[in-house]
Amino acid sequence: MKVDVLLGLQWGDEGKGKVVDVLTPRYDVVARFQGGPNAGHTLEFEGQKYVLRSIPSGIFQGNKVNIIGNGVVLDPALFKAEAEALEASGHPLKERLHISKKAHLILPTHRILDAAYEAAKGDAKVGTTGKGIGPTYTDKVSRNGVRVGDILHNFEEVYGKAKARHEQILKSLNYEYDITELEKQWLEGIEYLKQFHLVDSEHEINNLLKSGKSVLCEGAQGTMLDVDFGSYPFVTSSNTICAGACTGLGIGPNKIGNVYGIMKAYCTRVGAGPFPTELFDETGKKIRDLGHEYGAVTGRERRCGWIDLVALKYSIMVNGVTQLIMMKSDVLDDFETIKACVAYKVNGEEIDYFPYDISEGLEPVYAELPGWKTDMTKMTSEDEFPEEFNAYVTFLEEQLETPIKIVSVGPDRGQTIERYTEE
C-alpha cells in the first residue's frame, strides 16, 4: 500500500480539516506529519463546529487510527484542553490516538521566548501566533529539544536543563515574564499525555502499510508557508510540502501515492508577509465577510485577494500534486466578475514563474472571467453547476495542468461535490 497526502497549496487556511474529514471514510489511518497548535483545522460535524489544533481530523470517524507523527510539535497543555473538549462532546480518543515518542514538546518557556523574540524585532516582526512553534523547532534542530518520549524517563532532569537554558536567554533579552500558571497547566498536560499510546510511529505506520492498511497523511498550514519554499522569512518553521510527510512520519518517498492539493477559489493570508493579489478595497472586505475569513486559532482577520495561479503552479510543482480540491467556491457566488492572477509584472517585465523574492515591486497580471451569480450552497452534483462556474473550473485546470477532483460549496461535509474530470 501507498500513503496519500493531503496538503494546502496557498498560505494556509485552505480548508484541509473539512476535506480530510470527507476523505477519511476511505482510509484506515489518518496521520498528521508537521506543525503545531498554531494551525487550526475548522470542521462542522453533526451540527457542531470544532477547531482541531494538534489532533488529526480523522478523530470523528470512530474506527480510524489517528497518528501524531514525529514532525509535529506538541503543547501538552493545549493538547489536554483540545482532547478533553472532544471527549466531552462524545469523541473518545485514548484508544484511537497514537503519538510519536519522537515528536518534540513545546515548553512553557518556548512560548515566552516566542513573545520575547517578536517584541525584540519591533516593526520587523514576522507575526507569529505566539504558540512557541519557532523556538521549539529551533531547539529541535540545535539538538536541545525535549521529546514526548522523554516524559517516560529522566523527565525532570531533561526539562530542568531546557528550562534553565531558556531562562538565561530571556535574562539576556531583559524580558519580564511570569511562568507560574503556564507551567502549572503544562505539567498537568504532561500527566495527561501519559494516558495515551506513545509509540515509535515510524515503525507503526510502515507496519500498517505492510498489512494492507490505507493511510492519509494530513499536513498543516500551506505550501507558501514552507520554511524552504515559502515566502521566507514570513513562513512557518517546518516543511509543509509533501516531502514533509516522509520526514514527519518516517516513510520513504516511494510510499507516496496520490497528492491532494487544496486551494480556495480565491486566496487568503494571515499575518505579515508578501501577498501579490491582496485586495485593499471593498472587494477584499466582501470576500472576508462572505468567507468568514478570521483565524481559527487567533481570530485575526485574514487578508483576502484573488486566486494566484503563478503561486499555485509553483506549489503544484514542488509537491507533485496529482489532484486538486477547490474550497469555498460559494464565497464567490455574488460577484459579477472573477479575477485570476496569471502572471507577475516586475520592473515592467512580465513573468509567469514564482521568483526568489516577491516582497517588493511586484504587480499581478489578471485574467477576468464572468461570475456565476448563483447560490451554489444547495447543489449536490456537478450537473447543477452554472455554465460560468464550469468555465472558471476549466480555465483553472488548463492553467494549472492538474484536474480539480473535488469542489466545496459550503462548510458542511455534505456540501462537497466530486467531479469526474478525465485525467
Swiss-Prot record:
Positions contributing to Mg(2+) binding: 13, 40
Organism this protein belongs to: Phocaeicola vulgatus (strain ATCC 8482 / DSM 1447 / JCM 5826 / CCUG 4940 / NBRC 14291 / NCTC 11154)
Protein name: Adenylosuccinate synthetase
Keyword S-adenosyl-L-methionine among record annotations: no
Annotated residues for binding of IMP: 13-16, 38-41, 129, 143, 221, 236, 300
Pfam families xref list: Adenylsucc_synt
Positions annotated to bind substrate: 296-302
SUPFAM superfamilies given in the database record: P-loop containing nucleoside triphosphate hydrolases
Catalytic site: 13, 41
Details of cofactor binding: Binds 1 Mg(2+) ion per subunit.
Highest taxon listed in the record's lineage: Bacteria
Assembly with partners or alone: Homodimer.
Cystine pairs: none
TM annotation in the entry: none
A Gene Ontology BP annotation from the UniProt entry: IMP metabolic process
Keyword Ligase: yes
Catalytic reactions of this protein: IMP + L-aspartate + GTP = N(6)-(1,2-dicarboxyethyl)-AMP + GDP + phosphate + 2 H(+)
